[in-house]
């Protein structure tokens, strides 16, 4: 076997999947999807074809042309990270039909009961497939190397509607013939064609990596905010929908700016779905339908910077994709650079510089986090036997950004813009590795390897000496005020009069990891940071309070951990409680997780469990 990806059973000598046609019946009563997957390969194949699955039960594998069974086997011992290998024995076929069902514990899916939604009347389900969770929804070659087009026929309750990372084709009644293969998986046509059911059809015509497969089903409403953009939320969440429409009103301007910088927008639509608070990420760049946490809605338009990041992925990450997660920086480093270029034009250079400053602080914090695991401080790092969710960090984002910025600084912005457009045009709809990028870089910028130590940047540990810490008046002022706090001086009201969330975030992140409890409480008494509506500020302050042994804030910490599921907030707060705290803090961490666990997405559950098992 010649693996193409340390996180997949896919064999590089096998043909890759090019198209998947899915029929999906969503059963909200059991939290199970009954489905069939028609996989089309790049060429006919004879031999053992390896597929990735996780917690999937296969009823049968058929030749779609003859409907004759195709032999297959399922590994008896699941791999802790990769899941369960399914080996299908093909005899010259170029396609195969798999009838299967998912598990209630599918790692990509979070099923919400009616009581967990705004209306309290209807259930909700959504996906999160990055990095390696598409395999828990359908059998596939779950690697970014296998770019797929897909069609979906989705059967859902008629009181609900669906959105996907795909073009919506139509909503219609079900027909019995669609269920004939699913009957082998114990789902009859009577259920498929139930009076309370409806079918939604979708099509994704551009080839995408499997981790960008996405859907959400619930009672959804939307607002038009631009010619290419709708904002969706639960229809009962009127206040959230109104606030989101206001927060993201400038989206079309950002799309136009992205097109000026990086070339045509290839995905037609750029819609946004604000998910329930349990969504584990800030945003997910699913093409045509970006998923967002409600915590990015801050009321001052700064949440649009998350949208700028997901928009930038439309070129770097979605058009050009890392071939596997060892090269994740190719997705996120370029996208962080592209995001800041968009923000610089739309919101101003000062805001972009603040972004860089916050990122710089985050990068230095990650160096401390990984001081005993330096492999994780490399851009191109080895991940054999490593769960990508466990080592998710700011390194590929911020060190990757620094590397891209280093190239721009070397050749100048005008030349770099030309290079970037050529890079995107050359590799669009392809998945590449670091070496491919470096060879392209050296071919198009002759002598660059003599000016920049490319190997040190991509394979070296830590932060290279020629990285760039931002310089601006506001950045320097905030860093200076943070240093003064160490000496017992609090910022005056004049100092912070024009601060928004980003300024406070930068300030808090540059304070000592722990302070005198009286200092922390005095800061909060004056500026009410623990009550901030901006979770970046609130969580940064609460993290400081926990590490400073300010137990007066335990109630607010508990409340925060129970109302949001974004891992950016769960990780630092649970780590602070478990690692920096005493017996009381460790007990609080265990208690809160026990109470909140079922409200978190399965990916977030796994991350918190890993933190608690490490420190408690």
Swiss-Prot record:
Q: Name one GO cellular component term.
A: cytosol
Q: Which Pfam families match?
A: Leuk-A4-hydro_C, Peptidase_M1, Peptidase_M1_N
* Cross-referenced PROSITE patterns: ZINC_PROTEASE
Enumerate the catalysed reactions: an epoxide + H2O = an ethanediol
GO MF terms held by the record: epoxide hydrolase activity; metallopeptidase activity; zinc ion binding
Q: Which cofactor does it need?
A: Zn(2+)
- The EC number of this protein is 3.4.11.-, 3.3.2.10
Ligand binding (Zn(2+)): 309, 313, 332
InterPro entries documented for this protein: Aminopeptidase_N-like_N, Aminopeptidase_N-like_N_sf, ARM-type_fold, LTA4H_cat, M1_LTA-4_hydro/amino_C_sf, M1_LTA4H, Peptidase_M1, Peptidase_M1_C
Where is this protein primarily located?
cytoplasm
Print the keywords alphabetically: Cytoplasm, Hydrolase, Leukotriene biosynthesis, Metal-binding, Metalloprotease, Protease, Zinc
Q: What does this protein do?
A: Aminopeptidase that preferentially cleaves di- and tripeptides. Also has low epoxide hydrolase activity (in vitro). Can hydrolyze the epoxide leukotriene LTA(4) but it forms preferentially 5,6-dihydroxy-7,9,11,14-eicosatetraenoic acid rather than the cytokine leukotriene B(4) as the product compared to the homologous mammalian enzyme (in vitro).
Report what the protein is called.
Leucine aminopeptidase
């Amino acid at each position: 076997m010649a693996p193409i990806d340390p996180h997949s059973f896919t064999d590089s000598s096998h043909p890759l999947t090019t198209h998947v046609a899915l029929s999906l019946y969503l059963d909200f009563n059991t939290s199970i999807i009954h489905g069939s997957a028609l996989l089309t390969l790049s060429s006919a194949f004879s031999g053992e074809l390896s597929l990735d699955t996780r917690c999937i039960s296969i009823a049968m594998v058929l030749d779609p042309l003859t409907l004759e069974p195709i032999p297959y086997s399922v590994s008896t011992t699941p791999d802790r990270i990769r899941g369960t290998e399914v080996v299908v024995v093909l005899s010259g076929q170029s396609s195969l039909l798999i009838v299967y069902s998912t598990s209630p514990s599918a790692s990509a899916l979070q099923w919400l009961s009616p009581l967990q939604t705004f209306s309290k009347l209807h259930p909700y389900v959504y996906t999160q497939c990055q990095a390696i969770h598409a395999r828990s929804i359908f059998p596939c070659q779950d690697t970014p190397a296998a770019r797929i087009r897909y069609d979906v026929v989705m059967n859902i309750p008629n009181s609900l509607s669906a959105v996907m990372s795909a073009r919506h084709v139509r909503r219609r009644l079900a027909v019995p013939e669609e269920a004939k293969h699913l009957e082998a998986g114990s789902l009859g046509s009577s259920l498929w064609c139930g009076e309370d059911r409806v079918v939604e059809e979708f099509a994704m015509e551009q080839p995408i990596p499997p981790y960008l497969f996405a859907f959400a089903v619930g009672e959804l409403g939307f607002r038009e905010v631009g010619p290419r953009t709708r904002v969706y939320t639960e229809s009962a969440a009127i206040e959230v929908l109104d606030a989101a429409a206001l927060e993201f009103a400038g989206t079309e301007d950002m799309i136009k700016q992205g097109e000026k910088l990086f070339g045509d927008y290839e995905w037609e639509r750029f819609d946004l779905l604000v998910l329930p608070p349990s969504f584990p990420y800030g945003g997910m760049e699913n093409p045509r339908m970006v998923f967002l946490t409600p915590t990015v809605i801050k009321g001052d338009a700064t949440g649009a910077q998350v949208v700028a990041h997901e928009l930038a992925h439309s070129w770097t990450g979605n058009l050009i994709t890392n071939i596997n997660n060892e090269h994740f920086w190719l997705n996120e480093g370029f996208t962080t650079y592209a995001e800041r270029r968009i923000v610089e034009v739309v919101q101003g250079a000062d805001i972009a510089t603040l972004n860089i400053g916050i990122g710089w602080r985050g990068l230095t914090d990650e160096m401390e986090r990984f001081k005993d695991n330096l492999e994780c401080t490399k851009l191109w790092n080895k991940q054999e036997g490593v769960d990508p969710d466990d080592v998710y960090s700011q390194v590929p984002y911020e060190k990757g950004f620094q590397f891209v910025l280093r190239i721009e600084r070397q050749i100048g912005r005008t030349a770099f813009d030309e290079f970037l457009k050529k890079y995107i045009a050359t590799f669009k709809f392809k998945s590449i590795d670091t070496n491919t990028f470096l060879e392209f870089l050296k071919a198009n910028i002759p002598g660059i390897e003599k000016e920049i130590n490319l190997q040190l940047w991509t394979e070296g540990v830590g932060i290279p000496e020629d990285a760039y810490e931002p310089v601006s008046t506001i950045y320097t002022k905030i860093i200076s005020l943070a240093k003064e706090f160490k000496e017992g001086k609090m910022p005056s009201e004049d100092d912070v009069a024009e601060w928004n969330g980003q300024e406070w975030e930068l300030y808090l992140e540059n304070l000592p990891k722990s302070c005198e409890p009286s200092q922390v409480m005095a800061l909060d008494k004056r500026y009410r940071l623990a009550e901030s509506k901006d979770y970046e500020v609130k969580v940064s302050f609460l993290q400081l309070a926990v590490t400073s042994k300010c137990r007066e804030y335990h109630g607010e910490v508990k409340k925060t951990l129970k109302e949001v599921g974004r891992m950016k907030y769960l990780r630092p707060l649970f780590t602070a409680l478990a690692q920096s705290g005493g017996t009381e803090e460790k007990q609080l961490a265990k208690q809160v997780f026990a109470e909140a666990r079922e409200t978190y997405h399965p990916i977030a559950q796994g991350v918190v469990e890993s933190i608690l098992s490490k420190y408690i």
